[in-house]
UniProtKB/Swiss-Prot annotation:
Membrane topology: Single-pass type I membrane protein
Name by which UniProt lists this protein: Protein APCDD1
Family of the protein in this entry: Belongs to the APCDD1 family.
Gene Ontology terms: cellular component: plasma membrane
Gene expressing this chain: APCDD1
Tissue/organ expression: Abundantly expressed in heart, pancreas, prostate and ovary. Moderately expressed in lung, liver, kidney, spleen, thymus, colon and peripheral lymphocytes. Abundantly expressed in both the epidermal and dermal compartments of the hair follicle. Present in scalp skin Highly expressed in the hair follicle dermal papilla, the matrix, and the hair shaft (at protein level).
GO biological-process terms attached to the record: astrocyte cell migration; hair follicle development; negative regulation of Wnt signaling pathway; regulation of odontogenesis of dentin-containing tooth; Wnt signaling pathway
Natural source organism: Homo sapiens
Gene Ontology terms, MF aspect: identical protein binding; Wnt-protein binding
Tree of life domain: Eukaryota
Length: 514
């Protein structure tokens, strides 16, 4: 027996017994008492699950989140790193909102995934007016905006020549003199007073200003360290649809330059930048993707179709299998659960992406799934369906898990098994040295990336590593029905042993590994 496990058996069990174990605890099961190996596995599993479970139960590192309604957006807001938009486009943002409701926004574009080589910058000026709280996205505020001027300035001669030609092709006659564009000169793409407009040449839209959310938190419970985050609406994954899309979730947040995380080096660099001095972020090597260990959400995540959730992935690199639970909620701070999904399957070896710099491509297969309704509304929805289209007809109860593999998924949730998805991942380290795992952004049209050509070119919010290795899948099988939410009605459970294995599903058109 390894020394970490001996330590667990020596010190963890007395602590657990002092904490208090109920009759339903696996550690007090007669079979566990009579089999030391089973006891040891339970202890090791409890130790690692407690870390991941604790992180899911205490999102934002346990910080208390305050949401401003209506939001106060006046100030200077900046990206926290190099962002990836569908295309792919590599971008950093610097937005200023003024007391008279006008704004000036910089969008800095780059030729690589580390945002070290600026190619061009968009300078956007306009006016914004906050409206009512969103009827669609709880916790968000709707807004209207009006553009006054959009300019572009190129940072190399090659980019200036290419972009000028692109504008000429997209909007023939737009450039009056027809001469080539040059570096470090600002050119109009939109001017309100004369009606000139050719923003589609760069797939530009500012509809992100139509959905706004501001969050405040005190890092590490330190009242002297306030961090403010501005969430703006998401960008359509199809660049040709950006002008017609109304946001239904959020982009990665901007931080207030006045109240930002002091560990954010990129924040300080972007804050000092302008169109003539675009931010150049510190170069970093791409981390090799090794899908192993356990990963959990850092915050309550928002998805299109009014979904709030947390995720927990488990990867077994010894046999290329994966597991997960997606925990769904009805509120934007993930306090009121609606249902959870447990899924498992296999994944391919990773191949470096030729399309998205820094990305690694995988193929995921899902062949097993369980569903747990966590409120009466979801249970009723599942019971509406006739026949064996989603588990046993009319048998759904709140807090009781059912296997839907034998019914080839669940029609009510839009799940069909078996299922294959074409994924992309990348890995980074944050300022605290923690590993972050990004997987592909879901298509904005609600479809699934079930063909290679539909593979994402941008990413979702990252997961953080909560355990560097994972127990074998067969060791966890007995606990696959455990719930993050706490006690199911009529059951006595012990919180440290609740499996936080979570994978995500939209209620109307659920997509595997969302």
């Amino acid at each position: 027996m390894s020394w970490p496990r001996r330590l667990l058996l020596r010190y963890l069990f007395p602590a657990l017994l002092l904490h208090g174990l109920g009759e339903g605890s696996a550690l007090l099961h007669p079979d566990s008492r009579s089999h030391p190996r089973s006891l040891e596995k339970s202890a090791w599993r409890a130790f690692k699950e407690s870390q991941c479970h604790h992180m899911l139960k205490h999102l934002h590192n346990g910080a208390r989140i305050t949401v401003q309604m209506p939001p106060t957006i006046e100030g200077h807001w900046v990206s926290t790193g190099c962002e990836v938009r569908s295309g792919p486009e590599f971008i950093t943002r610097s937005y200023r909102f003024y007391h008279n409701n006008t704004f000036k926004a910089y969008q800095f574009y780059y030729g690589s995934n580390r945002c070290t080589n600026p190619t061009y910058t968009l300078i956007i000026r306009g006016k914004i007016r906050l409206r009512q709280a969103s009827w669609i996205i709880r916790g968000g505020t709707e807004a209207d905006y009006q553009l006054h001027n959009v300019q572009v300035i190129c940072h190399t001669e090659a980019v200036a020549e290419k972009l000028g030609q692109q504008v000429n092709r997209t909007c023939p006659g737009f450039l009056a003199d027809g001469g080539p564009w040059v570096q470090d000169v600002a050119y109009d793409l939109w001017r309100e007073e004369n009606g000139c407009e050719c923003t589609k040449a760069v797939n530009f839209a500012m509809h992100e200003l139509q959905l706004i959310r501001v969050e405040k938190q005190y890092l590490h419970h330190n009242l002297d360290h306030l961090v403010e985050e501005l969430f703006l609406g998401d960008i359509h994954t199809d660049a040709t649809q950006r002008m017609f899309y109304r946001p239904s979730s959020y982009q990665p947040p901007l931080q207030n330059a006045k109240n930002h995380d002091h560990a954010c080096i990129a924040c300080r660099i972007i804050y000092r930048s302008d169109e003539h001095h675009p931010p150049i972020l510190p170069p970093k090597a791409d981390l090799t993707i090794g899908l192993h260990g356990e990963w959990v959400s850092q915050r309550c995540e928002v998805r299109p179709e009014v979904l709030f959730l947390t995720r927990h992935f488990i990867f077994h690199d010894n046999n290329n299998t994966w597991e997960g639970h997606y925990y769904h909620y009805s509120d934007p701070v993930c306090k009121h659960p609606t249902f959870s999904i447990y899924a498992r399957g296999r994944y391919s070896r990773g191949v470096l992406s030729s399309r998205v710099m820094g990305g690694t491509e995988f193929v995921f297969k899902v062949n097993h799934m369980k569903v747990t309704p966590m409120d009466a509304a979801t249970a009723s929805l599942l019971n509406v369906f006739n026949g064996n289209e989603c588990g046993a007809e009319g048998s759904w109860q709140v807090g009781i898990q059912q296997d839907v593999t034998h019914t080839n998924g669940c029609v009510a949730l839009g799940i069909k098994l078996p299922h294959t998805e074409y994924e992309i991942f990348k890995m980074e380290q944050d300022a605290r040295g923690r590993y972050l795992l990004f997987n592909g952004q879901r298509p904005s049209d609600g479809s699934s990336p079930d063909r290679p050509e539909k593979r994402a070119t941008s990413y979702q919010m990252p997961l953080v590593q909560c355990a560097s290795s994972s127990p074998r899948a067969e060791d966890l099988a007995e606990d696959s029905g455990s719930s993050l939410y706490g006690r199911a009605p009529g059951r006595h459970t012990w919180s440290l042993l609740l499996a936080a294995l979570a994978c995500l599903v939209p209620l109307l058109h659920w997509n595997i590994r969302r």
